[in-house]
Amino acid sequence: MMKPTIVLTIICLVAAAALAGTYQFTKPMIDAINERMAAEARMTVLPTADGFEPVDTELQDGVIEVYKATNGAGVVVTSGFKGFGGLVTVMTGFDADGVITGVAVTDASDETPGLGSKATLPSYTDQFVGATAIQFNDASGDGTRIDGVSGATYTSTAVFTAVNAAIAQFAELGGAL
């Protein structure tokens, strides 16, 4: 008769092997879906582009990746900063003159539903379109004033900071490549 400890160990090993096998089997499909969604988001924030290629450059703090349009239409910068529940990932499109053409929150899955998720809606992100420099509405200085989202301060600040990081990255690149 086997001891309960040995039986439980065998069950755990079989379950772990099954989980690892499932992960290895589904990983290529998940990666393909994620890449397709990222490509669609890039087209959303820079609709005049005909395709994208990655840019090999030194990344600013918070910047995850940079893509340039293959037709010279502009650049898309993906950046992320901590919101209330976790990392908020934002994709920002710039035309060749450095004007923001679109902002899309690509991941805010850990933010509070109903509150933090408001910062992912076009009613918030569309404020950035057409700007070259931004600031929160209660700040002083140059730039387009951006209203925060009441009840979603952390999330709207994360989006704002991510867009500012994208602006800094675009400036570091010297504009569209």
How should each PLM-predicted stretch be described?
Residues 1-177:
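Flexible, solvent-exposed loop/hinge segments and secondary-structure transition points
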